[in-house]
Amino acid sequence: MKLALDPSMYRDDLTLEEMVYKTAELGYEYIELSPREDFCPFYKYPKVDSAKIKQLKRLLRDTGVKLSSLLPLYHWAGPDEDRRQAAVRNWKRAIEIAVELEVDLMNSEFSGSKYDPLTSEEKFIKSMDELLPVFEKEGIKLNLQAHPYDFIETHKGAMDMIRALDKDWINLVYSTAHTFFYDDGKGDIETMFDEAGDRLTHVLFADTYNHKAAHGLRYIVNPPDAKVTVHQHLDIGQGEVDFDTIFRKLREMKFDGIATNAVFAWVDERADESSRFMLKKMKEELGLA
């Protein structure tokens, strides 16, 4: 099993070099390299050259830290066609970067529009038609997650699409912070993990509150029909996700994939404390302490 840090809490304050050293200082062996402006930015063309890639590989060797995966985010499901075409170009470059980094796994989201799901699905499949041969040629695996505000928000929707793609190298990312979006507020971990089975190869750990609680009055948004979604990425125990069941199921399943600390809430307050707590908690509950 790989225990990784998503360094999002550090990306705006630390250089790439400082981020790698910080990861080592916190005790993590792996980095899940999420978007940052000087590497693979959110939704924009990658801003990294061969020299920076070599620098990163040297930093990783010096610290003993490894990359568990590269996490790009691009609008490959449109629904705007210009955005989709740009996303495919961005993905092709990101795959080249993964190959240069000697990383054989990328993870991402479906990245379409909640309010135009049919067009988004059509655009996503069109992008897959172009990109699947590139992934296969380069030997890169892909893990995908449903996400709030995406055209696929639910666990069932994610599993249906992963099965539709029908590639044994495309599997599921389960983000615990999205649990209540995955099944419309029920938070039924047991059922979702049983449904995923051996497709569950990647878990992002963070806690959240149930946005469906209090008859929908947990979060009050003005105007009432505003097109928004709300969730958190908190330390385990600070929200309402059933982590007892999550860890029990992962132990029963003999989960041996990637477990990533994906807490983002404490950038300005207690990032180091939170990151150390999450690593300790994951190790203890996954039987790695």
UniProtKB/Swiss-Prot annotation:
Superkingdom of this protein's organism: Bacteria
UniProt-listed Gene3D superfamilies: Divalent-metal-dependent TIM barrel enzymes
Range of residues in the leader sequence: none
Intrachain S-S bonds: none
Pfam families the record matches: AP_endonuc_2
InterPro entries linked to this entry: IolE/XylAMocC-like, Xyl_isomerase-like_sf, Xyl_isomerase-like_TIM-brl
Pathway as given in its UniProt record: Polyol metabolism; myo-inositol degradation into acetyl-CoA
Protein name: Protein IolH
Gene that this sequence comes from: iolH
